[in-house]
């Protein structure tokens, strides 16, 4: 039953070139018809590995996505904000103390932030102490500033990891996106100038636990790898594959949307940005199992039809429809012309809509043109009805289309949410509502003598002091001059002595002040 199961993935591969699932296969090239015997009929071999000529199988190990892998990978992290709490204390002349608390920010260092986070997670008692405001100090007639630098740790802060480019997405990032954590850059900037985001685990690889190791068989021909048989026995071709990294792991995105870490020496181009990877979930596996069962039934139906032909020695158009090749590639086409069994080499292609096969009434499109019927008969059981319509006896199971629709709707999305900076604090005052300080570093500054006056009061006081000093200087200078004048007068009197004479009184000359005084007293 394994060969029948191998039909599944090859059936999907060509259809995904167009991004759709095939509902039918029709020859795009049809060789000349030649009569054959009934014993030459055979069920088609739908193994792509044989179509490509890759018959050399060798065991190898590869990685693929885990079953049940969820596209939204969450990365636990935390935010770290640098906060400076300042206590300003002033003691006035009478000893009254006034304390004012202020909060500012600074840019934190990533290493210090991770150490602070470890303190908080470990429940270190120093963390509780760091939640307090700095203890204010005071000095008489002086302003004392006491500051404490703290690292605010807010956790958890969860970001989404994009596996395609390892970018991180969160509303706290500028434009909603961070290009990821690398060896040289261990943090992401945020909408707040003094806040950074860091993952709890330094290595993002721990968040990319989406792979599983598997073993399969690599199919090659002459050193060229054509495809491989996976762990479940399904063959997957490398035709149309492109290079794609998931979480930094190099691999290939196959045309059916699956991803494997297979390495090949062939020159394969990188995938364009719109090439996504299909999820590998339980629902997909369940439908895949139903599809495989359906394909096995078709294989069994082909063998039953062939057995009936061999037993009854008769062929009908309906039975020939079972011999049609179900996957694109080289095969055979059968028909009956004039009661003669005919065979032709054909190359089948997949079609998505019936309009590709029957573009107009009575037209069966083969190789870009309407194929002419012979007596109302085309090939592979396709005939022209009495009303002129083309009648195709079979079509693919609806389960196949259901499976492809599931794959197309379940892809790993590229997440580009729009960041709303207004939802994140921008001003320093808003940060006080949710900060939790950490790692205190207390500093104290003592100012010069301060009378507690405002700036204009200080200038007024200085002007008054200068004016008082000027008045005092003038007063002192004036006093000094008067004292000097008195001293000089007295010194002159002492130097003149008895030589001093006065105007005569009553015709007498008074020789001295003492004589004048004595005479005055005698006269009295």
From Swiss-Prot:
Disulfide bonds: 43-302, 54-226, 80-113, 178-188, 208-247, 242-271, 363-370
Keyword Magnesium: no
Changes after translation: Glycosylated and palmitoylated by host. Glycosylation is crucial for glycoprotein export at the cell surface.
SUPFAM superfamilies to which the protein is assigned, alphabetical: Viral glycoprotein ectodomain-like (SSF161008)
GO cellular component: membrane; viral envelope; viral membrane; virion membrane
Subcellular location: Virion membrane
Spans through the membrane: 460-480
Sorted UniProt keywords: Disulfide bond, Glycoprotein, Lipoprotein, Membrane, Palmitate, Signal, Transmembrane, Transmembrane helix, Viral envelope protein, Virion
Annotated glycan sites: 256, 338
Biotech exploitation of the protein: Primary surface antigen capable of inducing and reacting with virus-neutralizing antibodies. Almost all human and veterinary vaccines are based on the functional aspects of the G protein.
Virion surface side: 20-459
Record-level GO BP terms: entry receptor-mediated virion attachment to host cell; fusion of virus membrane with host endosome membrane
Lipid-bearing positions (S-palmitoyl cysteine): 480
Pfam families: PH_Rhabdo_glycop (PF24834), Rhabdo_glycop_CD (PF24833), Rhabdo_glycop_FD (PF00974)
First-listed, main subcellular location of the protein, grouped into a coarse class: virion
InterPro entries: PH_Rhabdo_glycop, Rhabdo_glycop_CD, Rhabdo_glycop_FD
Topology class, membrane: Single-pass type I membrane protein
Intervals, Intravirion compartment: 481-524
Signal peptide (from-to): 1-19
Miscellaneous note of the record: Arg-352 is highly involved in rabies virus pathogenicity. Its mutation dramatically attenuates the virus.
Family, as annotated: Belongs to the lyssavirus glycoprotein family.
Subunit structure, interactors included: Homotrimer. Interacts with matrix protein. Interacts with host TRFC. Interacts with host BST2; this interaction inhibits viral budding by tethering new virions to the cell surface. Interacts with ITGB1. Interacts with host GRM2.
Role played: Attaches the virus to host cellular receptor, inducing endocytosis of the virion by using different host proteins including TFRC, GRM2 and ITGB1. In the endosome, the acidic pH induces conformational changes in the glycoprotein trimer, which trigger fusion between virus and cell membrane. There is convincing in vitro evidence that the muscular form of the nicotinic acetylcholine receptor (nAChR), the neuronal cell adhesion molecule (NCAM), and the p75 neurotrophin receptor (p75NTR) bind glycoprotein and thereby facilitate rabies virus entry into cells.
The name this protein goes by in its record: Glycoprotein
Organism from which the protein derives: Rabies virus (strain silver-haired bat-associated) (RABV)
High-level lineage: Viruses, Riboviria, Orthornavirae, Negarnaviricota, Haploviricotina
């Amino acid at each position: 039953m394994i060969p029948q199961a191998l039909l599944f993935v090859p059936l999907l591969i060509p259809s995904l070139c167009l991004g759709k699932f095939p509902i039918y296969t029709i020859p795009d090239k049809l060789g000349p018809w030649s009569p054959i015997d009934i014993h030459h009929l055979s069920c088609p071999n739908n193994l792509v590995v044989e179509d490509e000529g890759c018959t050399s199988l060798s065991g190898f190990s590869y990685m693929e996505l885990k079953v049940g892998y969820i596209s939204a990978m969450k990365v636990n992290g935390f935010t770290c904000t640098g906060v400076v709490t300042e206590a300003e204390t002033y003691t006035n002349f009478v000893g009254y103390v006034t304390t004012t608390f202020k909060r500012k920010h600074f840019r934190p260092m990533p290493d210090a932030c991770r150490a602070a986070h470890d303190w908080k997670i470990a429940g270190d008692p120093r963390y509780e102490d760091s939640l307090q405001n700095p203890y204010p100090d005071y000095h008489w007639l002086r302003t004392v500033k006491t500051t404490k630098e703290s690292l605010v740790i807010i956790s958890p802060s969860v970001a989404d990891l994009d596996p395609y480019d390892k970018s991180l997405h969160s509303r706290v990032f500028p434009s909603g996106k961070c290009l990821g954590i690398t060896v040289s850059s261990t943090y992401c900037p945020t909408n707040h100038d003094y806040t950074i985001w860091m993952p709890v685990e330094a290595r993002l690889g721990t968040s990319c636990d989406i792979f599983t190791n598997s073993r399969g068989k690599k199919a090659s021909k002459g050193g060229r790898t054509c495809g491989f048989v996976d762990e479940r026995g399904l063959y997957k071709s490398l035709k149309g594959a492109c290079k794609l990294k998931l979480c930094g792991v190099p691999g290939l995105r196959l045309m059916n949307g699956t991803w494997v870490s297979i390495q090949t020496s062939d020159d394969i181009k990188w995938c364009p940005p719109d090439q996504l990877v299909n999820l590998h979930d339980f629902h997909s596996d369940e439908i895949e199992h139903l599809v495989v069962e359906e394909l096995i039934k078709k294989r069994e139906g082909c063998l039953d039809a062939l057995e009936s032909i061999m037993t009854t020695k008769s062929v009908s158009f309906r039975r020939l429809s079972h011999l049609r090749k179900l996957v694109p590639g080289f095969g055979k086409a059968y028909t009956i012309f004039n009661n003669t069994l005919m065979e032709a080499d054909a190359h089948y292609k997949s079609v998505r809509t019936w309009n590709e096969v029957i573009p107009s009434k009575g037209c069966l499109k083969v190789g870009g043109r309407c194929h002419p019927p012979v007596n109302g008969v085309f090939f592979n059981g396709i005939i022209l009805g009495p009303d002129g319509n083309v009648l195709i006896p079979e079509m693919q199971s609806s389960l196949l289309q259901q499976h492809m629709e599931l794959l197309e709707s379940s892809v790993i999305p590229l997440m580009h949410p729009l960041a709303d900076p207004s939802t994140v604090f921008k001003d320093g005052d808003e940060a006080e509502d949710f900060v939790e300080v950490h790692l205190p570093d207390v500093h104290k500054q003592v100012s010069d003598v301060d009378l507690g006056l405002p700036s204009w009061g200080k200038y007024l006081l200085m002007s008054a002091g200068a004016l008082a000093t000027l008045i005092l200087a003038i007063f002192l200078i004036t006093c000094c001059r008067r004292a000097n004048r008195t001293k000089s007068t007295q010194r002159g009197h002492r130097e003149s002595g008895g030589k001093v004479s006065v105007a005569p009184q009553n015709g007498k000359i008074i020789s001295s002040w003492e004589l004048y005084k004595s005479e005055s007293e005698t006269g009295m």
